[in-house]
A protein has these predicted regions:
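Generic beta-strand structural signal
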Residues: 80, 92, 103-107, 115, ...
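Ferredoxin-type iron-sulfur electron-transfer modules in oxidoreductases and energy-metabolism complexes
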Residues: 134, 138-146
Length: 337
């Protein structure tokens, strides 16, 4: 039996094209979008303001396309990791992180990743497939705690800018008035920085941007992150200086602090020099040990000194709380290999 096409993940423009093709009235596109993204139905039969005739017409070749997680793991700190099926024999993980006043979902954009960052388990897994907009949105749509969500971060498996078409479609659905109607301020997209994709993302999306930095020294960053060789951090910073980050959109840099590698005041000074003139902030991240990697994380005292030095020199810096390490859900630990 031929599988049906998912409606979930379609933008309003795509839904308008669909209803026109099926001979349905134009206003049906917004009705379908409302059922999908506002009322969050799981079947076409629930779309009761569409006539029975049109529901049956849709059902011939289409379905909502919602897929529940097939596995969950719960951390002692309340973090929950979910496993979603995506296509044949592929899976991705997403992580729900509840906090006092906010609840964040960390979602994936690819099965595996091509970037091969030295410190990341997803990179060790290698790349298998891009996620479709439907598979990206489904991580939110089918989340059991969906109604508690306040923020989404695209910091799970994969490099979002390496799957930019589908990522931009998903962001359009999340922020569009026809879709989830979220403020872009509730969404952060993280990237190693791909030249072509970065420029397009900044120009086509108002969501927050987080750059994986991890070293201000080109040679060292290239060793940690091969993507540095294609588009250096110094070139990236020069590109970013062409845009205004002082208003709605926030620009941040992620910096894993490794013991004896990038944790001294010398590196803090290099960071200040590199980022001078950019309206941005730094998030310091504790390294979470992964199998087969000899790197170690700096201790909290070292991270605190590093943060305080940057902050006193005018660069707003925070230490990100580590969550879900006991279930391999913390930063850099996601893998479905």
């Amino acid at each position: 039996m031929m599988s049906k096409y998912p409606l979930l993940g379609m933008t309003l423009i795509e839904l308008q094209s669909l209803v026109k093709r099926l001979g349905m009235p134009g206003f049906a596109a917004k009705q379908i979008a409302s059922w999908l993204y506002d009322k969050k139905v799981t079947s076409i039969d629930e779309m009761t303001n569409l006539s029975l005739k049109y529901r049956e017409l849709l059902k011939q070749n289409y379905e909502v396309g919602a897929e529940a997680p097939v596995e969950e793991m719960r951390s002692v700190d309340g973090t929950v990791k979910y496993l979603y099926p995506v296509g044949e024999n592929h899976f991705v993980e997403s992580v729900y992180i509840p906090d006092d006043e906010r609840a964040t979902l960390c979602i994936s954009s690819q099965v595996g990743c091509k970037m091969n960052c030295k410190f990341c388990m997803t990179g060790k897994q290698g790349y298998s497939a891009n996620l479709t907009a439907q598979q990206i949105i489904n991580q939110i749509h089918s989340l059991p705690e969906r109604d508690k969500l306040t923020n989404v971060v695209m910091m799970g498996m994969g490099e979002p800018l390496d799957n930019l078409e589908e990522v931009l479609k998903a962001l359009d659905i999340l922020t569009g008035s026809y879709g989830y109607a979220w403020s872009p301020k509730r969404i952060t997209v993280s990237t190693v920085g791909l030249r072509k994709g970065l420029q397009r993302f900044i120009e086509e999306s108002d969501c927050h941007l987080a750059i994986s930095l991890h070293s201000p020294v080109t040679a060292q960053r290239a060793e940690l992150m091969p993507a540095e060789k294609a588009f250096s951090i110094t070139e990236m910073v020069e590109l970013l200086k062409n845009y205004d980050f002082s208003k709605q959109r926030r620009l941040s840099f992620e910096y894993i602090v490794f013991k004896g590698l990038n944790d001294s005041q010398v590196y803090a000074k290099e960071l200040l020099k590199l980022l001078r003139g950019l309206d941005c902030r730094i998030n310091l991240i504790r390294f979470h040990s992964i199998p087969g990697v000899a790197l170690e994380g700096a201790d909290m005292d070292t991270m605190t000194r590093f943060r305080d030095y940057l902050t006193t020199h005018g660069l707003f810096t925070t230490i990100r709380a580590s969550r879900g390490e006991d279930i391999f859900a913390a930063c850099g630990m996601l893998s479905t290999a």
